[in-house]
Curated annotation (Swiss-Prot):
Belongs to the eIF-1A family. The keyword Protein biosynthesis applies. It comes from Natronomonas pharaonis (strain ATCC 35678 / DSM 2160 / CIP 103997 / JCM 8858 / NBRC 14720 / NCIMB 2260 / Gabara). This is Translation initiation factor 1A. Keywords: Initiation factor, Protein biosynthesis. Gene3D superfamilies: Nucleic acid-binding proteins. It comes from the Archaea.
């Protein structure tokens, strides 16, 4: 038995992407997120994710901050509960996020 038996390959941040936790649902396809870099941002859920991937408070997501407005971002990926637990175990995200 190997140590990686229960491990799943997860999507990791690329480029400017950062991990974040959804703190509040704002409506109109927008959520308030607390990012790993310590910034609170308003994130937009893109059309390709609407109605396909449901995002709730306390979900761990991957966001890409806007180049021209750092307090806003786009949601790129949502992690399921088991995936978020794995990220915490591996030290990629902390509970203080």
């Amino acid at each position: 038995m190997s140590d990686n038996e229960g491990r799943k390959n997860l999507r990791m941040p690329e480029g400017d992407e950062v991990f974040a936790v959804v703190t509040n649902m704002l409506g109109a396809n927008r959520v308030k997120v607390r990012c790993m870099d310590g910034t609170e941002r308003t994130a937009r859920i893109p059309g390709r994710m609407q109605k396909r991937i449901w995002i709730r408070e306390d979900d761990v997501v991957l966001v890409e901050p806007w180049d021209w407005q750092d307090e806003k971002a786009d949601v790129v990926w949502r992690y399921e509960k088991q995936e978020a637990d794995q990220l915490r175990e591996e030290g990629h995200i902390t509970d203080s996020v």
